[in-house]
């Protein structure tokens, strides 16, 4: 956990920002027009690009199809008599409401509450995985951590975080810091860099109208050796080498970031891949809104996201007044962009809105951000501090409990990218023998099994917080000494899996059930699917162990794996042991830490969860868990006939005295 939660941009934000000169000035009218351009531009791009989402992968769309037009979405615009919500704009609307409710710098805990209340369906990939972890009790950035969110490398944060930057006009360092902070709700490592770069460009675009210069300014805020930064520089070089051949440039970038991508992160939704398609669209669009929009669709992959992001960015650069009226008012009789209507079709408790009202509210928040960070308003002028920096709110971030076992080296960080720079201390309780605590990190090798209550404090921003934690050190894992594995499915049916709509790199999947007691809980080859046939029939899976000699058991550690859209989780769980006559008996009541999911709804299921299941001690030659697999519908023509399997990485067995 320690490695995944390290902020890759921290050093850059502290040391590398180039001098930006004196305070920036912009009129209130121009500021509001550019904020309007961000909202309206994103709506144009999202609705325009949606029909082409995931359509062009191996090859881009032909330029002969330009301009694409709204195609089938023109009818939807007419039906709703305005713009309609989608994930490229609706999460930002939620963030607008959260800033109004909690202030311009909400905490991760505030963000979690907002997500859980408003987002109940229509999320995918990293966003869905983050939501599931929130319902398990975690807060960001653990919800985006590499070890817990198997979609950490996908595009999700780029398309939902632009608002942090267009409420920070001309404050690029602040915008980058806040965008990076928010990106970690769903993502980690190099996958947050596109969000940070676009955050820098959105903020800089209030005062920069040259596309190439804008990209180069944004690059100042990424580490020199960052993977995405290298890709952006390659795009700039390709544009110089092939100024009239965007297809060639797209081919080269797609080969490196898709065809030849690491199999574990090779998807059409990869963050760097899609973020670079947006950069190419901007370069070859040369600042022309319509051409940039068409190119962002033609580049392919998850193209509606690029279309929304770059269209909003050009909207900031040139202002809403410069956006083509045939795109903002495509329905006869409309006299305002999208008829001044934003209709919610995606989120719970998110009211329909006047677009102008959304713009006004965002403008007010932008002024609040400016004034809170060394800027001010004088008459009709907004005076901005371009060197403002974002300091994350002080808070404990909540993730899984430390995974501690006698004799197994531990390295767990309670600290994360948002609070690792603050002062940590152990203020109460005694650590397990063999462990030490320093600056938020627990290290060492536990020597004695048991339960240990400790209190940690966190100091910064002029205040101190304290929080209690319960550490459980498990004894040696009896599963490692099992003589047999009990299960109803021993081998993954790879042919069935390959025919389904899967969203992970193929190295993730183990071929046999033998991995459940190999000690590996994450990463390539760690996840076993009990997928035996192309079936959607209800079934109960079981996993367990047998020993030649009886063992005492009172705890099972169930480690689930990554989940597909069409299955992998369970609706109920039971635990059984072998009695002296060789019959399976229920262990009786058991407790689970954390609690098992309270619903089997697909959107609320956590990936890579660890459940400690405790029950009265039994002495037995066999133990197993029975899992009632979930039947989940899916839209894909083959996948819709496949479900009812369990995703598992490890099953531990213990006797904790």
Model-derived regions: residue spans:
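Catalytic phosphate/nucleotide-handling subdomain of diverse soluble enzymes
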Residues: 44, 48, 55, 59-68, ...
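A short beta-strand micro-motif common to beta-rich folds, especially ectodomain repeats
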Residues: 450-462
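Extracellular/luminal low-complexity segments enriched in Ser/Thr/Pro
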Residues: 441-449
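Surface-exposed or secretory-pathway low-complexity segments enriched in glycine-proline
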Residues: 418-440, 467-469
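C-terminal edge beta-strand
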Residues: 463-474
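Aromatic, loop-rich ligand-recognition surfaces of beta-strand-rich domains
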Residues: 521-590, 607-657
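Accessory "access/gating" subregions that flank catalytic or transport cores
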Residues: 26, 143-152, 163-171, 180-185, ...
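Active-site-surrounding "flap" and adjacent substrate/cofactor-binding loops of secreted or lumenal enzymes
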Residues: 50-83, 89-93, 108-125
